[in-house]
């Protein structure tokens, strides 16, 4: 059984752009857009990669301190019947996965984020927010 809901897994596979956050050696947060990630069912983790990935700051940060967060989000256009008078014409949805991370070089450079906290919004329903801690004992190895 995955730490992600079926709806969260489906959403992870549809995103076009995400952001990965890491912490630099001086403690400064670093956030960068990424376009290549996937759920790794063998580890129930999120694998992130990209061009020349082992030469990126995010890769070096994870190699040094073993922590990362990925956020995948977007806006969903509302049907005119769903809109409140004077309200927004779209609503946010997304998922944030925080956790321990590995900087992997073989078979290709990537960051593997092992979830410790998952927060999703607007995925299961327009108004539902799902935030939970994930115990290390639930990770697949």
Model-derived regions: residue spans:
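A short mixed-secondary-structure module that forms the rim of ligand-binding clefts
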Residues: 36-78
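Hydrophobic/aromatic beta-strand elements that line small-molecule binding cavities or substrate pockets
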Residues: 34-37, 99-100
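A generic structural signal for short beta-strands and their flanking turns/coil linkers
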Residues: 14-18, 32, 42-44, 64-68, ...
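Short, basic/aromatic recognition patches
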Residues: 1-19
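C-terminal edge-of-domain segments
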Residues: 89-92, 96, 100-141
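Short, acidic, Ser/Thr-enriched surface-loop or helix-capping motifs
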Residues: 23-26, 96
């Amino acid at each position: 059984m995955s730490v992600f809901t079926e709806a969260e897994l489906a959403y992870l596979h549809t995103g076009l752009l995400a952001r990965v956050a890491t912490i630099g050696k001086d403690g400064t947060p670093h956030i960068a857009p990424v376009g290549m990630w996937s759920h790794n069912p063998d580890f129930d983790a999120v694998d992130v990669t990209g061009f020349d990935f082992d030469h990126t700051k995010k890769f070096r940060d994870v190699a040094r301190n073993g922590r990362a967060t990925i956020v995948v989000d977007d806006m969903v256009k509302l049907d005119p019947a769903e809109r409140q008078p004077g309200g927004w014409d779209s609503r946010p949805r997304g998922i944030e996965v925080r956790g321990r991370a590995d900087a992997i070089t073989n078979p290709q450079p990537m960051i593997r984020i092992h979830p410790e906290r998952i927060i999703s919004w607007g995925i299961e329903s327009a108004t539902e927010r799902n935030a939970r801690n994930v115990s290390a004992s639930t990770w697949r190895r």
